[in-house]
């Protein structure tokens, strides 16, 4: 059964372009944090469309890795600009769900840019914290920021591979509640 993506807000980049925006993700220097025209999110273990669970901004839904395939997820885009990725790691419905499932510890992010002609991969270490109330340049509303060293244009795909996990207490599979991509930012840090 295929579910459709619910767009929470819509903000205009230009008079002609309207992109979905997650309501509880922080604004960038340009005032927009968007899913950057993400067309779909695909889990590679079974080529399953998981767009609704990853892009709905709802902590009651999550994508859970069913097998250690590489890459775990692919986000298809339509030539967008991407400068950072915001991720809610774990199944964030409540503290019990969060502790039950594995959470990504180290992730590899591959950016396919220049309209699919080039790619680059970065590795990030995520913190293990259930919806922290901290608000900073790297945290907001439970989202952690993965800042790319530069903004990439013509991005057609973002692959995410979970390399290591923080172990959960029972349920199998690493969970991610939500992902958002931000454009029009100026990178000021290197990957952690």
Where are these regions (language model features)?
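Bacterial N-terminal signal peptides that target proteins for export
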Residues: 1-8
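Bacterial N-terminal signal peptides
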Residues: 10-20
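Disordered, acidic Ser/Thr/Pro-rich linker "stalks" and the adjacent N-terminal cap
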Residues: 24-76, 99, 187-192
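Trp- and acidic/polar-enriched beta-sheet ligand-binding modules for extracellular glycan
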Residues: 67-72, 93-187, 191
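Extended extracellular/luminal ectodomain segments enriched in beta-structured repeat modules
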Residues: 69-70, 77-86, 154-155
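A short beta-strand element within beta-rich, extracytoplasmic domains
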Residues: 80-99
């Amino acid at each position: 059964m295929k579910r459709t993506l619910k767009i929470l807000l819509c903000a205009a980049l230009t008079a002609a372009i309207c992109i979905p925006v997650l309501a509880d993700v922080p604004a960038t220097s340009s005032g927009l944090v968007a899913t950057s025209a993400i067309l779909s999110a695909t889990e590679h273990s079974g080529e399953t469309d998981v767009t609704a669970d990853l892009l709905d901004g709802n902590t009651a839904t999550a994508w859970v890795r069913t097998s250690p395939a590489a890459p775990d997820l692919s986000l298809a885009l339509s030539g967008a600009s991407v400068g950072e990725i915001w991720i809610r790691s774990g199944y964030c419905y409540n503290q019990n769900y969060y502790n039950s499932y594995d959470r990504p510890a180290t992730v590899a992010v591959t950016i396919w840019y220049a309209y699919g002609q080039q790619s680059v991969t970065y590795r990030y270490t995520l913190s293990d914290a259930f919806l922290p109330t901290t608000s900073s340049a790297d945290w907001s509303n439970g989202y952690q920021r993965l800042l790319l060293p530069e903004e990439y244009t013509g991005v057609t795909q973002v692959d995410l591979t979970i390399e290591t996990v923080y172990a959960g207490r029972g349920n199998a599979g690493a969970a991610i509640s939500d992902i958002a991509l931000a454009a029009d930012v100026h990178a000021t840090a290197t990957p952690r």
